[in-house]
């Protein structure tokens, strides 16, 4: 595995199935704890959402595929409303988690935010302490405590929070 080969490329319509599956694979352990969880229904909803995203039907949304050594291994979705960069989703296939890929992907988002002098926001589930530790290590701080999630923010380099 060579992290120097890591690429983030725009998702193509034919990759909607991959996008849905990588989200499911990355989140399956947490989702399956819910006794009412229906994997087939969840996957169908993820697929429909991915199809809308890659077709450009979600305003201000950019969905990308994370590629390492020529293999698709994850998904990154950002929303660009103009006053911030919101990471709406980052999923890395479980066999690639814990190898610094998420840090590198988020690092590229942070670099773009620094160039544009914009803050970066994201949400993390309270049931996902590993992701929260990663975000805190990168400098994100909890900006708002929500029922089952927390909104985290990394301020712009100029210090403004816009």
Ranges and model annotations:
Residues 7-21, 30-32, 143:
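A short beta-loop-alpha structural element at the N-terminal edge
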Residues 65, 71-79, 86, 91:
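Conserved beta-strand in the GNAT
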Residues 113-123:
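Conserved GNAT acetyl-CoA-binding A-motif
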Residues 92, 98-111, 133-137:
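Conserved acetyl-CoA-binding loop-helix of GNAT-fold acetyltransferases
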Residues 27-52:
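Conserved GNAT-fold acetyl-CoA-binding loop/helix
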Residues 1-17, 156-162:
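Conserved N-terminal entry element of GNAT/NAT acetyltransferase domains
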Residues 94-97, 122-132, 148-157:
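Conserved beta-strand-loop-alpha-helix junction that forms the acyl-donor binding cleft
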